[in-house]
């Protein structure tokens, strides 16, 4: 009996406690995945490395080798009796280092060697200059908003290269030691300022030491032609087919410690296009003083128009006028326009009779006509006729109204994506005006010039990291 009572008591206790336990289980249910390991990602995702940070650096190494063979039977000036043609091959070698860090820094260095074949011995001696020069070396970086700066040795090439040009035809090219401030306030306007201050040594101490304690030590011809430069260039996109540029430049000349002379050049350049017709015009004036201190009062203008008659044929006609001094002018003013840093080989005949080492005192009038023919998918041929005349009165023992004429032929062929071939032939038809201006009264008969150039410029290495 006692045993049955104990069993009954245990059963009653369980009955009383069961609702409480059940309620506790409902109020604190176990987590659905409690005790179950979380699912694992697919094996492919487990093996994929994390994404690298964005690449901010870009580096490119490129080179250029450009030999040019020339037969000069009257290039630069007519040959006279007793002179023989010059035959030579000049050569340009460049190694270019180009580094960019996002949009915050751009470094560019171009090392250059310029020589004539045969100048170096087969077993070369030690070259105290290292055999290389620096064509360009600059850093470009943003300042604030749309204003950036480029500092160092750099090419200054504006518009059509008429006043400031790269002079790429010359084996050495042309570069300046300058600061370039570039401001783009809108999609329509681009404003650029160029500033330079040079020292080059004097005639008595041509090697300028960086520790020179006093004196200007600047002599034209030992380094840059000018001592200081301030230039402002504004480019305005009138529309997709019409462009306008304005230029103001001040060049300061000095010889050693003498007072400097300042020459101002200012003007405008315009280009336009309508269907197959292209046209352009430029006009500039020069005031102030020239390098010798004479008053400067000169001007120039140029107009041109071209029409593409078909995909393979087009014509361009134009005229350039650069003022000069009349042969009987006794005013003492310098009226010769000076395209001081222009790529003049591009405009005034490929034989370089004018504005390449020689500025005609009487100026120049140069109407011309160019025909362009596409001879293949990778080749073309151009032919240009130039007529030359003095811009001012030119009189010696008689009046000269002409300085002769020139014909230039150039053939271009893209041999490979990084190899170009150029072949050219020019002839100059000299007359009494040419002889009087150049001082070659006893010149030889036929004057011509032939050249052939290879331009090899591969990209050697490129990396983004």
Where are these regions (language model features)?
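N-terminal periplasmic/intermembrane-space "pro-region" immediately following the signal or transit peptide
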Residues: 2-86, 96, 313-318, 464-465
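Residues that define the transmembrane beta-barrel architecture of outer-membrane proteins
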Residues: 57, 87-91, 130-135, 173-177, ...
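Residues on the lipid-exposed face of transmembrane beta-strands in outer-membrane beta-barrel proteins
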Residues: 67, 93-99, 136-141, 179-183, ...
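Transmembrane beta-strands of outer-membrane beta-barrel pores
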Residues: 67-73, 101, 111-117, 153-157, ...
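Surface-exposed loop and membrane-interface regions of Gram-negative outer-membrane beta-barrel proteins
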Residues: 71-91, 101-145, 157-170, 216-217, ...
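Repeated loop/turn-to-beta-strand initiation elements of outer-membrane beta-barrel proteins
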Residues: 103-107, 145-149, 187-193, 240-246, ...
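Extracellular/periplasmic loop regions
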Residues: 278, 282-286, 291-374, 380, ...
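Outer-membrane beta-barrel "beta-signal"
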Residues: 444-465
């Amino acid at each position: 009996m006692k045993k049955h009572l104990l069993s009954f008591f245990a059963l009653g206790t369980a009955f009383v406690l069961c609702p409480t336990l059940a309620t506790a289980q409902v109020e604190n249910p176990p987590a659905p995945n409690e005790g179950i390991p979380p699912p694992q990602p697919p094996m492919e995702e487990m093996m994929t490395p994390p994404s690298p940070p964005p690449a901010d650096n870009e580096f490119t190494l490129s080179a250029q080798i450009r030999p040019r063979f020339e037969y000069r039977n009257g290039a630069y000036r007519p040959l006279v009796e007793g002179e023989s043609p010059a035959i030579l091959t000049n050569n340009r070698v460049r190694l270019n280092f180009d580094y960019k860090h996002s949009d915050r820094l751009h470094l560019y260095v171009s090392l250059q060697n310029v020589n004539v074949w045969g100048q170096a011995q087969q077993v070369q001696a030690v070259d105290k200059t290292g055999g290389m020069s620096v064509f360009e070396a600059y850093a470009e970086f943003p300042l604030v908003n749309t204003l950036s700066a480029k500092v160092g040795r750099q090419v200054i090439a504006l518009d059509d290269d008429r006043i400031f040009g790269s002079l790429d035809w010359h084996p050495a090219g042309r570069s300046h030691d300058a600061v370039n401030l570039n401001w783009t306030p809108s999609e329509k306007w681009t404003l650029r300022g160029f500033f330079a201050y040079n020292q080059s040594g004097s005639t008595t101490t041509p090697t300028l030491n960086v520790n020179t304690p006093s004196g200007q030590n600047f002599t034209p011809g030992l380094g840059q032609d000018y001592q200081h430069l301030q230039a402002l260039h504004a480019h305005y996109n009138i529309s997709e087919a019409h462009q306008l540029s304005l230029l103001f430049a001040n060049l300061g000349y000095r010889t050693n410690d003498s007072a400097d002379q300042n020459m101002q050049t200012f003007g405008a350049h315009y280009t336009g296009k309508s269907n197959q017709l292209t046209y352009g015009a430029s006009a500039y004036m020069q005031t102030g003083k020239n390098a010798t201190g004479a008053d400067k009062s000169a001007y120039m203008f140029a107009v041109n128009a071209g029409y593409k008659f078909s995909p393979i044929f087009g014509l361009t006609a134009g005229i350039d006028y650069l003022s000069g001094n009349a042969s009987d002018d006794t005013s003492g003013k310098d009226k010769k326009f000076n395209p001081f840093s222009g790529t003049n080989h591009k405009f005034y005949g490929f034989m370089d009779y004018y504005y390449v080492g020689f500025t005609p005192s009487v100026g120049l009038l140069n109407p011309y006509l160019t025909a362009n023919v596409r001879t293949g998918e990778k080749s073309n041929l151009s032919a240009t006729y130039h007529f030359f005349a003095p811009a001012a009165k030119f009189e010696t023992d008689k009046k000269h109204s002409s300085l002769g004429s020139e014909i230039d032929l150039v053939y271009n062929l893209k041999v490979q994506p990084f190899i170009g071939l150029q072949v050219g032939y020019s002839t100059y038809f000299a007359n009494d005006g040419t002889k009087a201006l150049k001082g070659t009264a006893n010149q030889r008969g036929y004057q011509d010039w032939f050249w052939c150039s290879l331009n090899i410029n591969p990209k050697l290495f490129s990396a983004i990291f």
